[in-house]
Amino acid sequence: MRVRRAVAVLLSTVLAGGVVASPAGAAPRSHGDGGLPGRHSLRAPVTDENFYFVMADRFDNGDPGNDRGGLGDDPLVSGFDPTRKGFYNGGDLAGLLRRIDYIRGLGTTSIWLTPSFKNKAVQLEDGPSAGYHGYWITDFTQIDPHLGTIAELRALVDAAHARGMKVYFDIITNHTADVIGYEEGARQPYVSKDVEPYRTAAGRPFDDRDYAGRPGFPPLDPEVSFPYTPVLDPAERTLKVPAWLNDVTLYHNRGDTTFVGENSLYGDFFGLDDLFTEHPRVVRGMIDIYKTWIADFGVDGFRIDTMKHVNDEFWQRFGPEVLRFARQHGKREFFMFGEVFDTTKSFTSHFTTRDRMQAVLDFPFQEAARDFASRGEPAGQLGQFFVDDDWYTDADSNVYQLPTFLGNHDMGRIGGFVRADNPGAGDTEWVARDRLAHELMYFSRGNPVIYYGDEQGFTGPGGDQDARQTLFASRVPDYLDDDLLGTDATHAQDNFVSGHPLYRTIGDLAALTQRHPALRDGAHQHRYGDEAAGVYAFSRIDRHQQREYVVALNNSEQAKTAAVPTYVAGGAFQRVYGSGPARVTSAADRTLTVSVPPLSTVVYSSVKRIPASTAAPAVSLAAPAPAAESRGRMQVTANVAGSSFYEVTFYAQTGRSGWTPIGTDDTAPYRVFHDVAGLHAGTKVKYRAVVLDNRGHTASSRTRDARVPPPAVTIEAPAEGSNVRGTVEVRAVADPERATHVVRFERSIADGAWTTIGRDASSPAYTVFDDLAPLSLATGTQIRYRAVLAEPDGTRVTSAIRTVRYAGPPLTTATLHYYRPAGDYDGWGLHLWGDAVDPAVLAQVAWDRPWPPTRIENGWAEYDIPLVDDTQPVNFIMHLPNGDTVPTSREPGGDRSFVPIDAPQVWIVQGDPTVYTSPPPTS
């Protein structure tokens, strides 16, 4: 270990209190003795925004003259029907401009608009419903006429900029409106690449992943290249703009996605035309489209829809090129963030590390915030949640850039969640929990996003159309019966009330964080968490001010007291938010005792700076190792022998290259998850860490070596212990995934020899279909599968064995047993769907007509379900006719399912989301 003053690389400006600061993002420079500089944790320009996310059609109707988009009076042509939640309701850009100061009054610094491009007004196949939401684009160069004009957009952007606010566009690269049909019929089921590969115009099979991000993509022919033959209605051959979008070979043309595995990347979203984003023409075209909006309209950033459904190579080109263009055109703070609808940080962080995008929407935070504030889960869970923020740390991005949110237009509103999670609690508690969720969002790391209407206490019974109420007076019956939190108002009137308690709360939180910037983008250090509902506490520390803010939130319905660790011994702290003593003092052991009222938050700030360090602490590296959650990420952890505000920079070196910074962490435990997916297995990587203390001293660790592990291959299907018959899909995935992988599948019958049953080289999922029929197996025969992955460099990896059994004759009926303690089964039935269920049954089932019980026996309602394929899922919802409110008219658990070949009988119990495969206790 080397310890010295980092004079050569630190800015020699002495701040108040004698603290020496180094320049943010200082370029690393090796010293003659091999030393490496300490660096500050990255703070990109966008770590302190307050977003307001608004659906223009549902905000305010400033110009009734554009309601029908110039398409006439027929709602099935114009898409305008203010009495239906799935149609245009009348909001527009003029309404946004008229109410822009209402938005600003919340402390908003950035307005995020749902897509405003010209949409297909109505898709008759979808309900029917209209493109009011903006996600069915036909013309990427024009504003939807229902929303206004180019001139009105310019006026809105100018007005926002004049008020110090930015404007973000919601953009789409994954798909367009549903225009392409198939000769084989509309909206066909997905056909995998393993069943039918892509073919060149000459008919030669190929894997598109071999060409993604590279020149030389093979020529395609709509008659030859796809599993379905794409066709256009003659009236729509030139509907899309720019014109290249009318080339049907620039789409995947594989049928509808089920949002799982390969088809999640290649399938159509409910018929929406899925772009061939592996094709260089699509990549170039999308980059050019969005460059134009930056250059011509001065937009400040993009929210990118459906990011996880587009291949990595697209983002690796799109993000850096668009960002570079924006900065060349004067947008130094241009910022892009993507929708990755997943709550696993090892996955969501993939897009900001390997894919080089700036940020993603923080879906993991949304789930954690709901668990804490609405569901009253153990407070300590938040501690582990924030500790895992290290997944996002790399050399050019980190978690502080992520937009955080509590609900949205797809999943539903925080107001709806607190009502559903706390039935019968009453308005006072619902408002308190809603406020608590917003306090957590504003005081923790990230850029908070307010979903329009949340500031007025909007609720709604669910997501999608049920969470898209108008702020102006509604005529939609489904909205008119919604209750609002914190008010006696209804949706029958305009709701632009600046005096609403939640509007005031949000405005106050924004103002407070502006006065105390550390609460916006200071280091977020986990401090304390109760094992049950109670206090969660963390510190926010600005590296320049060096004052510690202690934030303590209580999700219990009782007052709680906690001794919160700090970096200050015997120091005074003053209250800056919440109720309690105006001034408290930390103990000699540096704990600060705070009392927090029920469902409330308090914030205290140290009066003086954190004590200045006299020397950098010792730092050492734990042995680097592949992360359990992602084999392409190497977990590198630094142990720092001290307890104060430190910033630890990690470096990596391969071969004879120089040391490269791979991220700086400013909160303990100090870690990065280095992306090594692009390196060959066995490659030696050296790591070092440099700690920078709060007075500019640095210390270096010794070097630790690691070798890049081989990829892992895992069989996904069939499920372990399942029953199979006929043709079995055997599917595997690799971690990390590379287009160069080849996977061989092997099978063993009754512990016999392993036999190869096929190979697959088509990324991203590897599949063979094993026909068992010729084997004439007896019922119960054991079958084992394994997968062997090969890389071009000779690496070979074998999966764990997957064991299944041969099933007996096909089942014709499955039975679901349902228990209600009171025996009140009248009206309760099953909404059914899926390929397992007899179509004759599905034809009888509707939302207002669920499948009824066959009998009531021994206190249970029993539902016999006729089948046509017992190997497929039976999907179900237990509810009353038209019932969609948990728990009064619908059972919890969302869309549930079971596979009859594995579970011919299942049991469910009132209020319990579990699907049991044996009778559960009912006492």
Predicted segment positions?
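Carbohydrate-interacting/catalytic domains
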Residues: 2-3, 7, 17-53, 68-71, ...
